[in-house]
Amino acid sequence: MADSPREGKVARPPDFTQLIDLASEFVGGKILFATDDFFAPAENLLKRDNPSFKEHEYTEFGKWMDGWQTRRKRIPGHDWCVVQLGIQGVIRGFDVDTSYFTGDHAPRVSIQAANFEEDKQPEIPQREVRTGAAATPEEFEAISELKSDDWSCLVPMTELTPGNPASSHNYFPVTSQQRWSHIRLNIFPDGGIARLRVYGTGQKDWTAGDPKEPLDLVTVAYGGACVGFSNAHFGHPNNLIGVGTATSMADGWETARRLDRPPILENDENGILLVPGCEWAVFRLAHPGVITQIEIDTKYFKGNSPESCKVDGCILTTQEEEDMVRQKWDLPGHKWKPLLPVTKLKPDEMHVLDSLTPELQDVITHAKFTITPDGGVSRLRLKGFPSSICLLRPREKPMMRFSVKAGFRANL
């Protein structure tokens, strides 16, 4: 018997879904063009929130749907849209989500990609979010400047499964190591898709920009990634290095309360809590470099921020990182160089701190952020200058699983 819309076992998502969604509207992704938006506009594809369903909601054009839905095609051709990624980078995989499109999902899909430098991208007029309409001849003419018919194919024409919970996520891994800036989503011939997730890692052109301006070397927008952590009960450490400011506590890293905390808390002579444990997260920088300034934002964490924190750095080769992942980051203490000593934190506040004196600012490839005893932080920025040293090679090995509540994250 077929699963009902609310039944069925959902398969475990692939590892690449732990990476950032390069196309999300939250990081600046946007729709440049869509052939048709009759029932629901293509902009819904890029929403950060999961799709929703309103059983009795209708518009003047038909059933309200939280996704992109085109009219039933009665002319030659097929529907497609063009997405400008919010973060340019290497794509590791797609999730074409058909949630709630159970009788009108797009039956087939293909995905193409291209890379345009910012100064070489043709000017595409900003489109209006609308329903009940198709692309105008002027819009077709403008988008033709991108020559999207000739873009590289990352996903060939493939059948999609309908939007029941057990089948709504259509995952497509990508092996290309190339940097991409734009996506063309083709549906054959028409229909609906709830969300398009483009998972990958940011990749910055380090030759561009002002060399005298410090950069956030750990941000996901440039390719930074969490490669290990002790606990992520309420929020993944990758959130710490996300784009922009946090939008809520859910957009930060928060651990469970440690069970080894003493019944009665006491301070040492410096006012630091005497507690036996701590929580930590390790990050691979987007580029080896020297950290000069550290920003720690506890915004939204008002009754659950850490008491204190510290930041250490080290330099590792790819092989050494892989060894540390297997050893759950049991790295000898002498390998870590202090970037920020134990520092008291205040709740719901931005802390801007200088890294240790210049003579101690070694080039690092990895940073370890330690909080005591537990709690939540919304953002971590490690600002500095990229080094010409580059020990890391492109990653070829498959990613490894992790335990969300008390595990470690592996090679992203």
Curated annotation (Swiss-Prot):
Organism superkingdom: Eukaryota
InterPro entries hit by this protein: Allantoicase, Allantoicase_dom, Galactose-bd-like_sf
One Pfam assignment: Allantoicase
One Gene Ontology molecular-function label: allantoicase activity
An example Gene Ontology biological process: allantoin catabolic process
UniProt family annotation: Belongs to the allantoicase family.
Function text: The function of this enzyme is unclear as allantoicase activity is not known to exist in mammals.
Annotated NCBIfam families: allantoicase (TIGR02961)
Protein's name according to its UniProt entry: Probable inactive allantoicase
Organism: Bos taurus
Gene giving rise to this polypeptide: ALLC
